[in-house]
């Protein structure tokens, strides 16, 4: 569960290291975001010569949460850290590589690019 002020790791090579959630998109007064939800983030830490810099406000999709996701068979997939992939205005990933595993819940029409770039799909 990601809410406002939550700090997330960045799971791509866009140049950002950590981001902070400033808004959960998708409805007024929506409080929490889970895996596959789009949030508005600000870059808190970035590497030199990256595609984004500190202070940039971009969209991101949540790919890993400590809360995890419950499957239809009753199993739960949890991760050690919260992580997101940064998106441009067309909802496409800014980076060209994805680090770490992602879940099968991202397998929708708009996030197939992330699924194909990910090294492991759980």
Swiss-Prot record:
GO terms for biological process: translation. GO terms for cellular component: cytosolic large ribosomal subunit. Keywords: Ribonucleoprotein, Ribosomal protein, RNA-binding, rRNA-binding. One of its GO terms (molecular function) is large ribosomal subunit rRNA binding. InterPro entries: Ribosomal_uL14, Ribosomal_uL14_bac-type, Ribosomal_uL14_CS, Ribosomal_uL14_sf. Pfam families: Ribosomal_L14 (PF00238). The keyword Transport does not apply. SMART domains: Ribosomal_L14. Gene3D superfamilies: Ribosomal protein L14. Belongs to the universal ribosomal protein uL14 family. Binds to 23S rRNA. Forms part of two intersubunit bridges in the 70S ribosome. Part of the 50S ribosomal subunit. Forms a cluster with proteins L3 and L19. In the 70S ribosome, L14 and L19 interact and together make contacts with the 16S rRNA in bridges B5 and B8. This is Large ribosomal subunit protein uL14. It comes from Idiomarina loihiensis (strain ATCC BAA-735 / DSM 15497 / L2-TR).
